């Protein structure tokens, strides 16, 4: 069967993967309202395309933190990719490098930073949680630096693990034979097989619930790598992130896996962009499944997007080739959207190219 869009990979992955694994990747917190809303909110944003513009040449390339990449579509950190495919993060790394874009490696990966680096050249970021034992954090960051990773994506929306009910029902645990490779030798590689998500006790015991803004300064003191703050969805926190020297912000609700009933990231994006006032770049993850979604995010001020579940499902369906094709499809759709909207480069994508349901007060539109 010819795969024609990114969503089709999820159907294949659901058929191929054990229920426990598919549910772990696919589910969100509690009622999963935000999980649905991350997608639905994109569908409420409409285009205002401009016509009769020469779009015979289109450039989708961009720069992120000074690094040249082929397109504003990057790979978000997702945990334990060997549950999806035996090659796990190595396949994702190779596919991302081939596409000329950035991969963010989860610190809860089933391949180590060194193994991922060994796949060849590529621009890679390292996702980090801060643990009570700061020595663990120092070791992880140093290893990422030495392996040539270019930035730290600090996850800040997880003082505790969200309640994912399918994981509780399935008694989720890391399948036998897989380990969290970055923690080998740190006495943290084993997950307690409790009756919750299996990760909850691990996170509760190790992730530092007292994490605060001052810890960003501490992190800057142990690394020269730029720090992206991942998990900002309000203007207030965006301003503080700038004050504390964040190199960038990732507007993220953790794939709707943490606090349910937070806004879709595409809805929260513009508030954050306006608060930042162009001082640092703002990125988005959550719900991106089409090239049209990428365009909408950029029109609302994002410098680029990260995709998470599409990489997992394409990996499960067809390994490295699946991830390559997924990225190529998103790129092709995005380029087509640019052409049909009258944009030849990312610079030309503007707020005037879209209409959102918060643009015009409803009472006003009712009068027109």
Swiss-Prot record:
Question: Which residue positions does UniProt flag as site: Involved in determining the substrate specificity of glycolate oxidase?
Answer: 108
**Residues with N-acetylmethionine modification:** 1
Where does the FMN hydroxy acid dehydrogenase domain start and stop, copy by copy?
1-359
What are the UniProt keywords, alphabetically? Acetylation, Flavoprotein, FMN, Glycolate pathway, Oxidoreductase, Peroxisome, Photorespiration
The UniProt annotation places glyoxylate binding at 24, 129, 164, 254, 257
An example GO biological process term is: defense response to bacterium
Q: Name the InterPro entries on file.
A: Aldolase_TIM, Alpha-hydoxy_acid_DH_FMN, FMN-dep_DH, FMN_HAD, FMN_hydac_DH_AS
Q: Would you tell me the protein name for this molecule?
A: Glycolate oxidase 3
């Amino acid at each position: 069967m010819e795969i024609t869009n990114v969503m089709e990979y999820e159907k294949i992955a659901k058929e191929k993967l054990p229920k426990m694994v598919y549910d772990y990747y696919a589910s969100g917190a509690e009622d999963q309202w935000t999980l649905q809303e991350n997608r639905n909110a994109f569908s409420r944003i409409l285009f205002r395309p401009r016509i009769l513009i020469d779009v015979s040449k289109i450039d989708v390339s961009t720069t992120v933190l000074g690094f040249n990449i082929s397109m504003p579509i990057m790979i978000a950190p997702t945990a334990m990719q060997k549950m999806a495919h035996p090659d796990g993060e190595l396949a994702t790394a190779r596919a991302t490098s081939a596409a000329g874009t950035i991969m963010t490696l989860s610190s809860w990966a089933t391949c180590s930073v060194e193994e991922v680096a060994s796949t060849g050249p590529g621009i890679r970021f390292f996702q980090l949680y801060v643990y009570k034992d700061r020595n663990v954090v120092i070791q992880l960051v140093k290893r990422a630096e030495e392996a040539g990773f270019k930035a730290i994506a600090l996850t800040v929306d997880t003082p505790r693990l969200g309640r994912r009910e399918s994981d509780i029902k399935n008694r989720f645990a890391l399948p036998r034979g897989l380990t969290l490779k970055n923690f080998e030798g740190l006495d943290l590689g084993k997950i307690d097989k409790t009756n919750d998500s299996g990760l909850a006790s691990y996170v509760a015991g190790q992730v530092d619930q007292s994490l605060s803004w001052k810890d960003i300064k501490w992190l800057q003191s142990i690394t020269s790598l730029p720090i992206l703050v991942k998990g900002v969805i309000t203007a207030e926190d965006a301003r503080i992130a700038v004050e504390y020297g964040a190199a960038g912000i990732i507007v993220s609700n953790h794939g709707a896996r943490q606090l349910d009933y937070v806004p879709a990231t595409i809805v929260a994006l513009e508030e954050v962009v306006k608060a930042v006032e162009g001082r640092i770049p703002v990125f988005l993850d959550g719900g991106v499944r089409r090239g049209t979604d990428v365009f909408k995010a950029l029109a609302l001020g994002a410098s680029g997007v990260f995709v998470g579940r599409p990489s997992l499902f394409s990996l499960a369906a067809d390994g490295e080739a699946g991830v390559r094709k997924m990225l190529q499809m998103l790129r092709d759709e995005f380029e087509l959207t640019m052409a049909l909207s009258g944009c030849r480069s990312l610079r030309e994508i503007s707020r005037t190219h879209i209409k959102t349901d918060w643009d015009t007060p409803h009472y006003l539109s009712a009068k027109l």
